Every structure is written in C-alpha cells, then in structure tokens.
C-alpha cells in the first residue's frame, strides 16, 4: 500500500509538472511569439508587390520560400533559440541585460567596454523604434483584410486601425493581467489556424515543398544577381520579433520558449508561408494579399477578427517590452528616472511607465497617419529589426570570447557566420532609409543622443561634485576637536561617493549647526546583474563617533526600496526606526558652461533631463514626511 501510495504521489507530481510545463508553453506563445507570428500577414505580400520586381512564377516563388525557410532556421532556430538564449544574465535576457553582461566581460578593456555600451545603446534605441512600428504595421495589415470582404471600405482602414491602437495604449495604465490570461489560448488558436490554412494551400499544389531544398535559394541569387541582396530587405520581415525570444526569457525561461518554437510556432509559420506560395503558383494575381486570399471566402471575416486580436497581442508584447527595457536602463543609469507603476500585485514584471506609453502612442499614431498602409510601413520595419539583431550579435561576441572563454577556433567561425548573415540583412535595408526607413534611424538617433548625454552628464556631474569633496576621515577628526551639538535619531545622507562628505551634510552643518547621534553615508550601487540576494544586499562599516558607511546593492530588475533594504542592516549600534530616521538628499541644479567634458548644447540638454527626472525621493521609495532636500548648483 505504501508503494502504491508513493507511485500515486509520483504520478500526481508528474501530472502537475506536465501541466505547469504546458501552461508555461502556452503563456510563452501568447507573449513571445505575437510579433513573428503575425509576419505571414504581410511578408510575401511585400516581397511580390513591394517594388522589388520579383517574378510571381515557379522559380521566383520557390526561391523566396526557400530563403524564408532557411532564414528562419538559421537566424531564429539556430542563432536565437539554440545559441543566444544561452547568453542570459542570471536568467534575464534583452538588450540591456546583454549590455550589462558585455560590460562585465570587457571590464579590463576600457575602450572595448565603451564600444559595447555604444552598441547596447544603439540596439536599445532601435528597439524603441521597433516598438512604434510593430503595432502600426501589424494592426494595419490585419484590418486591411476587411477590404477583401467589403467593397469601398479601404478608406476606413486607417480610422479603424487608429481606434484599435489608441484603445490599446489607453488601457495600459490599468494593466493587462486579466485579459493577458487569454493571450496564450488566442495565439495558440492563431498558430493552429496558420498551419491549417497552409496545409489546405499545400494540398492544392504540393510541388511547393521543393522549396525545402536550399538550392532554390541559391538559384534565386544566381538568376537574379542584382535583386538578391535587396530582396533580403523584404525576407527579413519573416524574422521580425526574433529579438522578443531573448528579451522575454526572464518571464518564461529558455526551455518553454524553445519548445514552443519547435513544437508549434515554426511548423505553423513554415506551413503557412508554403501554403501562400502554393496559392501564388496557382494564381499569381493573389500576390496582392496572399494571406487572406488563402482562406475560403466564408472564413474571411472571422480570420480578420482573429488576425486583429493576434496583432493587438503582438503590439502588447512590444509595449510591455519597452516598459521592461526602460526600467532596466533606468537602473543601469542610461535613462533619466521616471515614475514606474506596478499594475499587478502578483507579477512584479507587470509595470506601466506613463512617459514611455504616451511617447509610443504618439509615434504609432503618426506612423499610421503618415504611411497609411502596411506595405508602405514595411520599409521602415527592416532597418530597426536588422540593426537590433546586428548589435545583439556584437554584444554576444564579447561575452562569448571574454566571459565564457570559448576557444577562438570554435567561436570565431560561428560568430563570423552570424555577423555575415546579420550584415547582409542590414545592408539590404540601408537603401530603405530614403523610402521610409529613416523613421527608426531618426527615432533611434534621438534616443541614442538622449541616453548617451544622460550617461555622460551623470559621470561629469559626479566628477564636478567630487572635485571639492572633503575626505570623510578629515571631517570626523575635525568634529572630534570641535564637537557640534548632537541630536537624537539617525540621519541618512545619500551620496554617490562613500569616502567623502556629502554636500547635504556640509549644508546641514552650516545652516543648522547640529549632527544626529547616528550619521549614515548611504551609497546605492547598481549592479550588472538582474537581482542581488538579500544576504548580499548591504555592506556596513563603522567609522566611530556615530558615523557609518552603508552600501546597498541592487540589480537592474530589483526594486530599489531603500527603507526596506535598511531594515536588513542588523547591527546593534545602528537604528533605522522609521520615526527616528531622517533622509537628507542633495538636489543638483546644473548650469551648462564651457568647461571641458561636454559641449554647451549637450550640457543644456542634460540640465533639462535632470530637471525633469524623478528625484531620489520617489525612486528610492523614501517616506515623504522624513525627507529634507538641500539644493546645490554645479557647472558642467
């Protein structure tokens, strides 16, 4: 009986584990694969009607299908799923997490480290551009299907798309926890429908399966040498969203994402692309919208509805990704602090950042109004996608060679293969800059300027403050000679440098001429890792005479809650009772000057960013009634 019971318990646990794995797989499909899953809506349409001159004939169709298939296998299956997903930063992925990893890998090489940071900022900047383009092109392409069902409705495509998109951004503040539970089942349904449509199309023209032979892709380049590289600018549309596999790894882990790709997503995508190809072999005129024309006429309206839901889910994924990327960038010091709201009491990762939300919404609305169709927007899409992919490969190269210590004889050929393919795709999209691709380049350029100015400005600000800093040991020696009046309680002074006297402490002494019985110089350290365990959160050093130095360590995914962290400082001599603790902050006002380090116009830009950034009070969750803020002017 005992043996039977243990078998029953083991079986129950096994069922629970299987159910959890299935749940994670379905959830990953809903969040991770929305973008790449909606690519069949517009990829082949853009290839054959986007002005590339690709003939809709036997060789042209098979050549393009072979290019799409082997691009999916090389870039997504091999590069991302089997390789890039292993380059996690303690389970976290994405551009900022990878930049932090590359920064650590190149710590001994300052110039190379700077280059890695620049690549990371470029990748992040292009991701924000992608976060505007994805909702616009996806929803437009879905709604355009209505034009096939109803005559004369084409002029309603833009207004309907705008209503859907604006509504999506308006609900962000309230969170998507409830409706988010439907994302997985809806996207699973979407991929099943993709596969079913593809099987139906292939059954009408099975010869399309010849495209599995990579020789057709090679043949396309041979027959169309002038068109070969250029057409990659449209083929890459089949790969949009590949970066999401890596960016969302922290939510689901590598295995559920990989399993979902190989079990459901990849087969469904390949079947659908081949089904569309089979349709084009039978009816070349279907190139105007092969996705929707692949469906029976009775299924057109339900398919438009399902496609619209799928594109909204894809849009939600990149919006959430932009929020997550912003939080990481703030913690790592690349973006000014902004107000971050949590939209779920259970999920720490579900956040809302108003400034990012409204900026994205304005960008998306302008894109829809300006471009009016998914085909026109497709030109802008490839630049952002391929640029981000290229930056990811460069960052991974540094991690692979310098942190993982892979033998160059193994690593270099592999990395050269990745860089060669990424470089080809990027080169194919460069000419598109004048055809609409300028948008992500300009948006990325502006964001890169803002992030680099903020990072450099903060460095110069700390240097200027440090120039006249009074060493802490000297200060403590002086108060031993002339002791000031001491009052009960603990004074916490936030400072970037823990071995010097903060300006706020000097100002307090100058104006109030008192010191608290306990004086804590607190430095918050942002680490190049996602989370810091509680037992590694703090370092405490006692200087005597009631002076203490405390270092608090936070990862870029941690909530920097200073009062909560200080409660962990178990030291007999140190008292952080809330009503006996006062926090002293220094508020710097920057004045741009002609001093070395930064041009005057960038100095003014940094001053503007600093003025509008969220202060330490909110960012560190300090109690409003226990904070004193003292101002100081700094020239940079």
Curated annotation (Swiss-Prot):
Keyword Cell inner membrane belongs to the record: yes
Topology versus the membrane: Multi-pass membrane protein
GO molecular function: potassium ion transmembrane transporter activity; symporter activity
Spans traversing the lipid bilayer: 22-42, 64-84, 115-135, 150-170, 182-202, 220-240, 261-281, 293-313, 351-371, 383-403, 408-428, 433-453
Localization per Swiss-Prot or TrEMBL: Cell inner membrane
Gene Ontology cellular component annotations, sorted alphabetically: plasma membrane
Catalytic activity as recorded in UniProt: K(+)(in) + H(+)(in) = K(+)(out) + H(+)(out)
InterPro entries per the UniProt record, alphabetical: K+_transporter, K_trans_C, K_trans_N, Kup
Keywords from the UniProt entry: Cell inner membrane, Cell membrane, Ion transport, Membrane, Potassium, Potassium transport, Symport, Transmembrane, Transmembrane helix, Transport
Top-level taxon in the UniProt lineage: Bacteria
Family to which this protein belongs: Belongs to the HAK/KUP transporter (TC 2.A.72) family.
Protein name: Probable potassium transport system protein Kup
The species this protein was found in: Pseudomonas putida (strain GB-1)
Gene designation per UniProt: kup
